[in-house]
């Protein structure tokens, strides 16, 4: 924008409107500037003003014309059509965009050169330090995972810190920015904070040293009573109602409120925190805690629901709060659960009761951990048939609140993936070895300071086998869909993987599921200096995410021989039919188990408390009016439809394979 100096006439008019300046020569204005809407304003340092043409329509039908009233500006650029009034102290060292509304604020300033929260060290997982993550505007859950957990590679950590420092220094400035269409109302102190477009800050107490990365498609809302120090808040997030954050990163579309308190913590996409407390936690995508009595401390979580009163301890009153733990993706805690760190809980497991024996159940996913008389009992695989697990898997993609097209986290929602299925292979082998070592007639088996009952062990093996059948069958059907094969050779050619990437171990790096070989290749690239920018690291994660199904097939192809005893390179149509029959059996069997589990929610016991003051018939009628009946429940109907669709899908492939067999 071209600015001009004020005319003598304009200076006189401004003075008559109670305006002052240390040096009127340093006040420059837009070509069409009018003094009409500038009153009781003091200027110092270099000040640039835009035009004041438009009005703001406020709730209650009040109109306010853009302009400056009762404000002190020091080294400030004000864009077109802004309304700034009733600033108790001053605004210093800021560039303010157009159409921004700032009213009744204590002070807004940048003091010295600031990095606006970039480069702040967050002591995640270990309160005493050693796993610090340097936060930045482009931080993804996957970057943070590597930086926090791969400390056995010091060269990698040094390089990643270097990359973040480069970014932080590049964006450091002695001048802050407030974007376009921003609203800041009834707010206390804002110091060293960069504020993006379309942000709403209303009734906030204090913001110090941070970035609010709001934009038009994903605005950020900061609400009443909020206090944030040393922070970064990403697009589409809401921090409201007395939340207090200190040294925290808040990812995209997160919601923190109702007096939630967090320090040294990272919250990634779609996390929710209300009422409770977080300390040194790594909250991967969809970590949700709603209750006042819940403390999450020194743990790594993702796709997690914390029950009321869920607590952990990272302190054994010896060398300080030095312990940490992990609940792998999809793990949940019930009310009043407690875990003494260190411990590791397998994916999609449920934790009930108090667990103090440092169990590691990472190779037994989909389990229940239940405490009886201070002993941890493990029920392996049982969560595979839980209606809650299936409901969770369906709800997460629907609850993705990210509207920003530039997504920081690459989230894989699959319940069954090479990551979880490889653990089922290990879990099945572990359970078989336990049975072999202790004898088939043992009542109780011991595993990593946990106990497994005989019946639970036998069922666990069966659950894992059903899930493996389902996953491998899904992969084969997907690979062969939509093609009319004329010979076994054509089938084998189609089954052959497109790439060698995908074999071996897979990892879940906080939402992104990828082959370990690819993560290692990225790490080698960072160490060598080949990958040396934050955007390059994120581009590599995006590539892994977009190639997931290609890599997944490579892994599944190799597992066909291990599980079915069939060499894939010699596979025939009959072999495919055998796999699909097993798959149909697994899918339908699992869906029926899920339906049976859902049916418990419609039992007579579930009707307790319904039909107040009435007979049993009235109880049933009241229940039906409130909850509906089993047959018409949307979830149950979806499961029954799923059985129908999957059976038809399997039959269609079997039909194609039979035509090959007949040739």
Feature-to-residue mapping (PLM):
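Extended non-catalytic interaction/regulatory regions in multidomain proteins
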Residues: 1, 22-26
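Intrinsically disordered, low-structural-confidence terminal and linker regions
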Residues: 1-9
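Glycine-rich hexapeptide-repeat left-handed beta-helix
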Residues: 13-21, 29-52, 56-68, 77, ...
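Right-handed parallel beta-helix
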Residues: 61-69, 164-185
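Long, charge-dense tracts
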Residues: 89-90, 94-96, 100-101, 106-116, ...
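Long, compositionally biased intrinsically disordered regions
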Residues: 111, 372-663
């Amino acid at each position: 924008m071209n600015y001009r100096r004020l005319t003598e006439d304009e200076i006189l008019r401004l003075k008559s409107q109670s305006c002052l300046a240390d040096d009127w020569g340093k006040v420059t204005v837009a070509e069409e500037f009018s003094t009409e809407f500038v009153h009781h304003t003091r200027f110092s340092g270099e000040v640039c003003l835009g035009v004041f043409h438009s009005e703001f329509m406020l709730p209650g039908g009040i109109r306010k014309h853009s302009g400056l009233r009762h404000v002190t500006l020091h080294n400030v650029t004000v864009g077109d059509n802004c309304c700034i009034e009733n600033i108790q102290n001053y605004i210093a060292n800021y560039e303010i965009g157009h159409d921004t509304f700032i009213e009744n604020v204590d002070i807004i300033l940048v003091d010295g050169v600031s990095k606006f929260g970039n480069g702040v060290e967050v002591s995640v997982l270990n309160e005493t330090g050693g796993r610090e993550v340097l936060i930045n505007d482009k931080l993804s859950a996957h970057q943070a995972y590597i930086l926090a957990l791969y400390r056995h590679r010091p060269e990698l950590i040094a390089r990643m810190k270097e990359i973040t420092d480069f970014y932080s220094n590049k964006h450091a400035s002695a001048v802050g920015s407030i974007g376009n269409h921003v609203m800041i109302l009834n707010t206390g102190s804002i110091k060293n904070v960069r504020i993006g477009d379309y942000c709403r800050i209303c009734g906030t107490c204090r913001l110090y040293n941070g970035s609010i990365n709001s934009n038009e498609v994903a605005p950020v809302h900061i609400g009443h009573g909020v206090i944030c120090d040393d922070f970064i808040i990403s697009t589409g997030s809401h921090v409201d109602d007395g939340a207090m954050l200190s040294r925290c990163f808040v990812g995209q579309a997160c919601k923190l409120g109702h007096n939630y308190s967090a320090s040294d913590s990272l919250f990634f996409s779609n996390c929710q925190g209300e009422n409770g407390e977080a300390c040194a936690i790594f909250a991967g995508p969809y970590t949700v805690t709603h209750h006042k009595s819940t403390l999450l401390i020194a743990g790594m979580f993702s796709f997690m629901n914390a029950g009321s009163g869920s607590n952990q301890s990272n302190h054994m009153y010896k060398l300080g709060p030095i312990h940490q733990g992990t609940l792998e993706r999809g793990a949940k805690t019930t009310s009043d659960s407690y875990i003494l760190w260190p411990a590791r809980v397998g994916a999609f497991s449920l934790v009930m009761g108090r667990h103090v024996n440092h169990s590691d159940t990472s190779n037994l996913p989909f389990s229940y951990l239940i405490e009886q008389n201070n002993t941890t009992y493990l029920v392996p695989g049982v969560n595979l048939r839980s209606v809650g697990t299936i409901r969770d898997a369906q709800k997460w993609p629907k609850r993705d609140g990210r509207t920003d097209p530039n997504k920081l986290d690459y989230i894989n929602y699959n319940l069954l993936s090479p990551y979880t299925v490889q653990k089922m292979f290990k879990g099945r082998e572990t359970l078989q070895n336990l049975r072999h070592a202790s004898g088939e007639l043992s009542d109780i088996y011991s595993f990593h300071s946990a106990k497994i009952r005989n019946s639970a062990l036998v069922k666990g093996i069966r659950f894992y086998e059903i899930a493996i059948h389902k996953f491998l069958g899904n992969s084969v059907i997907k690979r062969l869909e939509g093609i009319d094969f004329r010979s076994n050779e054509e089938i084998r050619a189609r089954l052959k993987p497109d790439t060698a990437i995908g074999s071996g171990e897979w990892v879940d790096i906080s939402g992104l599921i990828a082959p370990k070989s690819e993560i290692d290749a990225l790490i080698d690239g960072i160490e060598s200096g080949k990958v040396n920018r934050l955007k390059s690291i994120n581009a590599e994660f995006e590539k892994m995410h977009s190639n997931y199904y290609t890599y997944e097939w490579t892994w599944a192809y190799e597992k066909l021989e291990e599980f079915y005893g069939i060499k894939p390179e010699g596979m025939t149509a009959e072999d495919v039919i055998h796999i699909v029959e097993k798959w149909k059996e697994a899918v339908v069997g699992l869906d029926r188990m899920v339906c049976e589990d859902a049916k418990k929610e419609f039992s007579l016991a579930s009707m307790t408390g319904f039909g107040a003051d009435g007979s049993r018939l009235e109880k049933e009628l009241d229940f039906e009016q409130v909850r509906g009946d089993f047959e018409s429940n949307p979830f149950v109907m979806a499961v029954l439809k799923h059985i129908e669709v999957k059976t038809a899908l399997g039959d269609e492939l079997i039909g194609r394979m039979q035509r090959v067999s007949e040739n």
